Amino acid sequence: MAITNADNAFGLRAIGKVGQNRDNQGLSEYGIAASSAAIYQNDPIMMAATGKIIVGTAAAVLLGSLNGVFFTDATTEKPTYANHLNASNTATDIVGFVSDDPYERFEIQSDAALTAAEVGLNADIVYAAGATPNYVSKVELDHSDLKTAIAQLRVIGISKDPQNNAAGVANVNAVVI
């Protein structure tokens, strides 16, 4: 029977820190503009020129990954916490919780077969919008972009997830910084 990896992209999932420092999984708070584009859990985040955060794009400087949002619902006026932000949200107090520690390690699915020999290379992301009902990111590591030059992510290992750790097989999960 051939070894396969589950094809289940999930964006940049924080999994711990590099080295022996404290791993408190702390999140920083950043403002998000009303009626912003949809942002899903684990989407890569970047800072816009407005000082608000938005979904990261390929080749942009990434701030971290979204862990959730808080806002006062414009219709019900109730405080609301969610793992994502709908594009149609008109709240004026939206705050995003971002895993942004520079020592944070993330797990991300590769969009092709990543081999152990490619650990240490750099690559950008390839964006795909998240989906309902879970509102989790579908962003993946752009395998075709692997290089020694500067990029958004550096591959530092292959995941230990038993459903996605078969190196050299499509959809393997990589550990990145």
Where are these regions (language model features)?
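Surface-exposed, low-hydrophobicity beta-strand/loop segments enriched in small/polar/acidic residues
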Residues: 1-177
